[in-house]
Each structure stands twice: as C-alpha cells, then as structure tokens.
Regions:
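N-terminal cap/leader regions of alpha/beta-hydrolase-fold enzymes
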Residues: 1-257
Length: 257
C-alpha cells in the first residue's frame, strides 16, 4: 500500500497573501505550454536551469517574483503552467470567500492532467536546454508542485538536485523514488504534512541513504514560502530564509561554490 505522507491540497492551500512587484521575465511556449522565463543579468549566469513547479494558484505574481529572484542568483528559471490556463488565480485571488469556486471539482480536473502536462513539458525543456554536458537541472516546487520535484529527482527524472516547501499530494512511493539531493522547508504545524508523516519522510530518506535536509519553521502556516504575509516580520523572515536555503542547496550540489 502506497501510504500518504502529505495529504491532498485543502482549504489551507487557498490562504495567503498576494504580493506586489514588477516581474522582469517573459512568457513563451514550450511544447504548447505557457512557460515563464526568468534570466540572470548578463555575466551572472551559472549555466544551470531551474524548473519551477508552482502551487495551485499557478503562474501568478508571487511566482513571477520568486522566479526572478532565483534568476538573480544565476539560474535560468522556467515556470510551467501545468494547469494550462486554468489555475485558481484565474477564478479568484481569495477563493475561500468565493462561493462560486468549487475547489474539489477543480482538483479532480487537474490532479492527473497537471502530471501529464508537467511530464511533457520537462521532456521538451530537456530537448531545448540541455545544450551541453555542463548544463545541469535543479527543481523547486511548492505545495501542488512538490511531488513533481520528487519525480524529477527519481531515476527517470532530469534533475540533479531539488527542493520543496509545504508539500501536498505526496506519497511514500514519491519519496522512496528520490535518488538525488532534496531539501524540504516546512511548517512545524501543517494539517497536510503532520508530525508522523514528516518523521516518516525522514525515515525513508535515511533508510535509502538519501542526501537531504529538512528545515522546520514554527509559527508559520502552510503556504508561508510562496504566499507568506510580508507585513509580518517573522513570516517574512521565514520566507526569506527558505529562499536562501534553497539557493545554497542548489549551489552546493551543482558545484557553484
């Protein structure tokens, strides 16, 4: 039996703050799928590619700003619209207070379709961006996107390192399949990724001799890394710390330091 580690996305995935800023990337299509492309400043490139798998809000301002920030750290960052134009942000930025939005139906529609779109997209990304043996791939995923990172860290994936924050839809098989270094950034209290399942995740990675690290923040909720309240000093700090930790993790394993 493939036991659940992180439960399916729930109402906690619909909370959080929408951030403000001016994105600097652009959108193009890769195998017919909209892709946000954030590039480093000239001369700052490290030669590697970061795949960005968003939460249920899809490609929206919070993601754009994070991808731009990853790019400023040297990574050409590619964000995938695996909801194919139908993310939650299409309907509302405050879906908890929108009586017309049916989250359960939306999840049913996109659970497997997003997996298929992501797999097709990754294959096309590799064909376009793996231009030499020196190009390496990393992956980052938030909530809905976490399991896609584990897929890309498996024997069938293309990534050499990955990181996830506050995962959902994560089963034991996803973690058993991880063969490359993985970093997890999670809240101390998360109804989707509870203490027992968090401990089990560490047990599996340890049992499999995995290269991993887990960062646990108290007093933040599910979604803090992607939709944290920037007006709250501690929550802003936690969000910034998760980002710095992810970049350091990528840099270490990809030989940028």
């Amino acid at each position: 039996m493939d036991k659940v580690l992180a439960k399916p996305a729930d109402l906690c995935c619909l909370k959080g703050e929408i951030h403000t800023g001016e994105p600097t990337g652009s959108v193009k299509q890769i195998d017919g799928i909209d892709t946000y492309v954030a590039k480093p400043q000239p001369g700052k490139e490290n030669g590697h590619i970061l795949l960005f798998f968003p939460d249920a809000f899809g490609l929206h301002i919070n993601c754009f700003l994070m991808m731009d920030a990853f790019a400023q750290c040297g990574y050409v960052t590619l964000g995938v619209d695996y909801f194919v134009g139908d993310p939650i942000s299409k309907y509302s930025y405050n879906p908890l207070n929108d009586p017309n939005f049916d989250f359960e139906s939306w999840k049913d529609k996109h659970l497997h379709a997003s997996e298929e779109a992501a797999a097709r997209w990754v294959k096309a990304v590799k064909a376009e961006y793996a231009t030499s043996d020196t190009v390496k791939f990393a992956a980052v995923g938030y909530c809905w996107g976490a399991r896609f990172v584990t897929h890309q860290l498996s024997a069938e994936g293309i990534c050499q390192v990955g990181a996830i924050a506050h995962p959902s839809f994560l089963n034991e098989s996803d973690v058993f399949g991880v063969k490359e270094p993985i970093f997890l950034s999670v809240p101390a209290k998360d109804n989707l990724f509870e203490d027992e399942q968090r401990t089990r995740t560490v047990e599996i990675l340890t049992q499999e001799s995995g290269r991993f690290n887990m960062q646990i923040f108290s007093n933040v909720g599910h979604g803090f890394a992607s939709r944290g309240r920037l007006t709250d000093p501690y929550e802003r700090w936690a969000k910034e710390q998760h980002f710095k930790s992810f970049v350091d993790w990528f840099d270490f394993w990809l030989g940028n330091k």
